[in-house]
Amino acid sequence: MATAEAQIGVNRNLQKQDLSNLDVSKLTPLSPEVISRQATINIGTIGHVAHGKSTVVKAISGVQTVRFKNELERNITIKLGYANAKIYKCDNPKCPRPASFVSDASSKDDSLPCTRLNCSGNFRLVRHVSFVDCPGHDILMATMLNGAAVMDAALLLIAGNESCPQPQTSEHLAAIEIMKLKQILILQNKIDLIKESQAKEQYEEITKFVQGTVAEGAPIIPISAQLKYNIDVLCEYIVNKIPVPPRDFNAPPRLIVIRSFDVNKPGCEVADLKGGVAGGSILSGVLKVGQEIEVRPGVVTKDSDGNITCRPIFSRIVSLFAEQNELQYAVPGGLIGVGTKIDPTLCRADRLVGQVLGAVGQLPDIYQELEISYYLLRRLLGVRTDGDKKGARVEKLQKNEILLVNIGSLSTGGRISATKGDLAKIVLTTPVCTEKGEKIALSRRVENHWRLIGWGQIFGGKTITPVLDSQVAKK
């Protein structure tokens, strides 16, 4: 525990947060007491495998997003990686751009002396961003789509030493079109490995590739993530080109769980046991320490007749963290760790992933069947048919077909029970807490891989009434 306390101690110079005089209506995503401690903008890094997504995040934030043993060994991202970074701008108007922009880790002070020779200015904190590092492997497409659900903007990475587009590049671009992401920066990475003429050629390829897509007209920035070349230019673009997304702090708080874990070590004394921790992205509202919360669908059970019952979990927030920064309240943006009093066995090994956490009695319904209006891609992305330059055609949805459905941060199986025109009914393998108007992504199994085939919007469905135990809140 001492190390954790020491790490929190590093934050002496961060702005203090005080719950007693918190006025939510006056909060903005750029309030000093908010951006001092937590990120308020989510930026996804997307692109083909091994094009340098995680390296770019490390160059900006200093954080290695590849954390798990099997990821490190294979040098690929499997789970969603998160890293927060503070972006500063020198307050001396004579400090030339782009050197007047710099980035550092989330736990650093809000003001730093300018590093340029003979500059008397100070770097002031202007943005606090969270990078959602998505996997580029086609097999991990579901994880990528879960990431797309929480992004405000995207960095599309294209390696300079390979032809453009690579299969996952086009698949990811389709995914961010589904999620209606408008803010995109294109990074031409590994520029140190190629000649200038190659870089110009590839620049033409990239502009041609993004024509007619959501990324058309997006700035293309040449960088080298390994050598940290042009990272200051990227910081300048993030500040000037990506607007701060509008947030509704007065809405009921809602967090989609992307990770959950049990922080207790084996052999821990019963008196020292800590409750489970849920990590996720807040979509709306403000979560506060001491607040009573509900997690839906909660504990899902099936009886011998196949009937599903859901028991929402009730608890209280005991702590909030953004990386190593302790919070009194958390707003949308970045990955927030929520320490609760939930039985840790319910949280261990990502058991709560795909669930929704929020204020008691203010969460949406739990759906077992969804009625959607859907749109299919014309061709499969990243799958070539023999002798054909274009992708394989996407077949229509068949009755009783099994698809992979992505709703928020949940990936679950779904069986098509009926289809007519562009409408379909899907019976889900696991119930989901969602609402009408939400977007979902549909993937089909092709050649042993789940491939994105289209998306849909929920307009109805069959809900489950949750079972509430007699003692509603476990305090």
UniProtKB/Swiss-Prot annotation:
Residues 133-136 are annotated as: G3. One of its GO terms (cellular component) is cytosol. Its EC number is 3.6.5.3. It is an enzyme of class 3 (hydrolase). This is Eukaryotic translation initiation factor 2 subunit 3. Keywords: Cytoplasm, GTP-binding, Hydrolase, Initiation factor, Nucleotide-binding, Protein biosynthesis. GTP binds at A50, H51, G52, K53, S54, T55, N189, K190, I191, D192, S224, A225, Q226. CDD domains: eIF2_gamma (cd01888), eIF2_gamma_II (cd03688), eIF2_gamma_III (cd15490).
